[in-house]
């Protein structure tokens, strides 16, 4: 079997700092590496044009590579300040809603073209129906416990009882949710740190992913918008 030709730009598992230049099919950001050998494209999901990111190559071929987002080092000039804690599940929350709609529409149309082979999709596509609520629209949220936390100051892992979400790109590390994420009930999320303290005071251990031991693993909350009850 002939050996597959590799590119001269990146290797699998290599960690790079990349400038996202454009937005591509499937909701992936496009970064490019330039050298004497030419230009090489790297696709990074959950990123925005203008961001400087740290990413790890997880797929490499002759013509392009795909990378997993590790961290956003510098924001895009399109991003705006929001009063919410950033979480992995909402990578576009700092974009104005008009730009969110633009990128999501472009991504949807490109899927119909590239996978569905529908060339005239623009003529067939009726405008999507926007949610009446830009924020706090979810009626269910699942939080995870972890015995390994993320230090936002040192940007390293540490032994800590955490309750929140998995750190982006790391299955075994938790990131405490200390305030409203903008997705679920504000009062509930502002008080999640008190629930975490209650669990700590119980003396029972949070889930330790690598060791697969621990008592607290998931915390699931549902909300009824009809009765405004959790």
Segments the model singles out, each with a brief description of its role:
Residues 2-230:
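Accessory RNA-recognition modules of RNA-modification enzymes
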């Amino acid at each position: 079997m002939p050996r597959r030709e590799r590119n001269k730009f990146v290797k699998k598992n290599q960690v790079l700092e990349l400038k996202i230049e454009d937005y591509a099919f499937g909701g992936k950001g496009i970064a490019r590496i330039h050298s004497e050998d030419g230009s090489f494209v790297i696709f990074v999901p959950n990123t925005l044009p203008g961001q400087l990111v740290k990413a790890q190559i997880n797929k490499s071929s002759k013509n392009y590579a795909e990378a997993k987002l590790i961290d956003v080092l510098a924001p895009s000039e399109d991003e705006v300040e929001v009063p919410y804690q950033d979480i992995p599940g909402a990578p576009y929350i700092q974009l104005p809603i008009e730009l969110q709609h633009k990128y999501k529409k472009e991504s949807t149309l490109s899927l119909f073209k590239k996978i569905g082979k529908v060339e005239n999709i623009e003529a067939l596509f009726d405008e999507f129906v926007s949610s009446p609520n830009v924020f706090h629209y979810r009626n269910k949220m699942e939080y995870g416990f972890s015995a390994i936390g993320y230090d936002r100051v040192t940007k390293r892992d540490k032994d800590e009882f955490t309750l929140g979400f998995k750190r982006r790109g790391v299955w075994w590390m938790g990131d405490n949710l200390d305030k409203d994420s903008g997705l679920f009930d504000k009062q509930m999320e502002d008080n999640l740190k008190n629930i975490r303290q209650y669990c700590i005071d119980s003396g029972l251990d949070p889930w330790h992913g690598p060791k697969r031991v621990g008592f607290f693993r998931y915390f699931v909350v549902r909300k009824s918008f009809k009765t405004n009850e959790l």
